[in-house]
Amino acid sequence: MQKIEFGSTGLVIEKNGFGCLPIQRISETEAVKLLHKACDGGINFFDTARAYSDSEQKVGAAFSGMRDRIVLATKTGAQTAEGFWRDLETSLRTLKTDYIDIYQFHNPAFCPKPGGEDGLYDAALEAKKQGKIRHISITNHRLAVAQEAIDSGLYASLQFPFSYLAGEQELALVEGCRTHGMGFIAMKGMAGGLLRDGLTAAAWMAAQENVVPIWGVQRESELDQFLQCIREGAELTDERRTTIERDRRELCGEFCRGCGYCMPCPAGIEINQCARMSLMLRRAPAQAWLTEEWQAKMHQIEQCRHCGHCMAKCPYGLNTPELLQANYKDYWEVLAQSRK
């Protein structure tokens, strides 16, 4: 096992964490079994959110009798102090705990600070004083907000998208967290499903100092990969380095990460999949994306109004309408080829 001290919190965390967003999609019985297997296999860090429908409920069902074995993180997307307290009390009740180790502001458009009109940070300070949360943290998809959070000295950790496709700016955030005594939680370690080899991703993450990836898991086979890394370690072999370099050549640049912050689309387009369809066609079995259901979803791109809604919401500054049109054109060409 590879355990690290998490920033300046005093918490000791297994280097591989469990991202609890995907357990929304399975039954409570299946989720509890999966969470118990993860914990028994050495994973002790579990990250969920108020926004993840019944994820907190399933985590609470799994760990209410073994709270001292895990480090628990959740999130609030509240915009006001009143909303903060409502979310916190709901999370405590649903998670069946009287405290949360790492309580995170969930992708705010700004960096909450003491004395702010929103009252969010002051509410968090009061919750910490009351013992309901141990550490105040933040998640984000925006480089500017993430950097401001690091520079502020107000946060115990930052959660940010980070994989072996990361560029210099993301790597600078990791280094900034390290020098400021903050933990760094890596979300989207598989780049939103674009990376296919979990062992290669885990091997690369293992070499990143002060980084705790949270792997989004909903199947036992997925969990087994990461438990294997914990048991045996994951060596960054020449073969895996070759895989990383190939993926970097193919995927770095202007591509949709599938985060979904542009949704819902006023024209009903499933942007977080349609805007990266060309990549999915080439990195997963293509036939799964060429069904009548997906053809109908791609046809919906024809209804794009170029209203700018998606561009204004995109944390990566992408020209989403252009991406949609490029993916639309490519999709029908691939479909036509498949029918020959």
Model region roles, listed by residue range:
Residues 6, 18, 46, 59, ...:
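Conserved, mostly hydrophobic/aromatic
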Residues 17-29, 73-85, 109-111:
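Active-site mouth loops of central-metabolism enzymes
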Residues 79-193:
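Glycine/proline-rich, positively charged
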